Amino acid sequence: MNKINYISFFLLITLGNLNAQNLAVLQYEGGGDWYSNPTALKNLIQFCNAEINTKMNLEPQRVSADDPEIFEYPMLHMTGHGNVFFNKETLQNLRTYLLGGGFLHIDDNYGMKPFILPQIKNLFPNIELTEVPLNHPIYNIH
């Protein structure tokens, strides 16, 4: 079993056995509508609870990208259209969150990609982004 499979297995077992977890929608600056698609995360939570037996609370919270409260959530959901901006403090907060094991799920409703990619590059300037192929094990949970 490779490292990704071990990590995925550990996460599935751990998340499945924890008490209910809160997830949050990430509020960000820049004028993009971070609040769009309000049912997306709720639908994802319902799917995960039903299909992989997680115990996530059905009502997601909302947290600002610069707020230390992001560390209270194992996963942040980011969505919207258009501009995204992270200032220096926000970048540091998100970087610390991600390096500490937090997960950021970015749902590009449409039109977000040209704005979010430079911000991701600012988060991790020394790391080259690569696309995960569709046949990667992470896409197969059953």
Regions found by a protein language model. Give the residues of each.
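Aromatic-Pro/Gly-enriched surface loop or interdomain linker
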Residues: N19-M75, T79-G82
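Extracytoplasmic/secreted proteins, especially bacterial periplasmic and envelope-associated proteins
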Residues: T39-N43, F47, E89, N93, ...
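Surface-exposed patches in mature extracellular/periplasmic domains of secreted proteins
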Residues: K55-V63, I106-N109, I127-L134
